[in-house]
Amino acid sequence: MSRNTEELQGISLLGNQKTRYPTGYAPEILEAFDNKHPDNDYFVKFVCPEFTSLCPMTGQPDFATIYIRYIPHIKMVESKSLKLYLFSFRNHGDFHEDCVNIIMKDLIALMDPKYIEVFGEFTPRGGIAIHPFANYGKAGTEFEALARKRLFEHDAQ
């Protein structure tokens, strides 16, 4: 059940030896491919331990591990494009909470998943660690209720 060339059209970054790293926020770099199992509900999880953004006030770097979990529908995010997209935040000035919500919204726009959650585990600055959590469940489905439930239980992980 290998993927054929036609199914891989639109994937341009994976395997490209001349990778160009974006110098600014670049949601357009995200690429998607078809989910071969849209009738199965399953989680895909990414752990991204090298996320960096800038404080919008001081310009100082902020570091985080970003956790992305989603239940795909028709489309899935290609991992190298996700890596480059997350790298594009390196020179982007935004608060931790904004970064997590932007990542979630960009991935929703790309994939239209059944469910998605993004959790940012930012390293402490000034003695305070900020851990924003954002999620979404497709309206009118069981995943809308899942999102509500997970929102209030996410700290129990």
From Swiss-Prot:
Keyword Cell inner membrane part of the UniProt annotation: no
A Pfam entry, by short name: QueF
SUPFAM superfamilies membership: Tetrahydrobiopterin biosynthesis enzymes-like
Keyword rRNA-binding recorded: no
Pathway(s) where this gene product acts: tRNA modification; tRNA-queuosine biosynthesis
Cell compartment(s), UniProt: Cytoplasm
Binding of substrate, residues: V77, E78, S79, H96, E97
Signal sequence extent: none
This protein's UniProt keywords: Cytoplasm, NADP, Oxidoreductase, Queuosine biosynthesis
A single cellular component GO annotation: cytoplasm
Entry annotation: catalytic residues: C55 (thioimide intermediate), D62 (proton donor)
Enzyme Commission number(s): 1.7.1.13
GO biological process, alphabetically ordered: queuosine biosynthetic process; tRNA modification
Catalytic activity: 7-aminomethyl-7-carbaguanine + 2 NADP(+) = 7-cyano-7-deazaguanine + 2 NADPH + 3 H(+)
Main enzyme class: oxidoreductase
MF (Gene Ontology): preQ1 synthase activity
Function field: Catalyzes the NADPH-dependent reduction of 7-cyano-7-deazaguanine (preQ0) to 7-aminomethyl-7-deazaguanine (preQ1).
Family per record: Belongs to the GTP cyclohydrolase I family. QueF type 1 subfamily.
Name recorded for this polypeptide: NADPH-dependent 7-cyano-7-deazaguanine reductase
Upper classification of the organism: Bacteria, Pseudomonadati, Pseudomonadota, Betaproteobacteria, Neisseriales
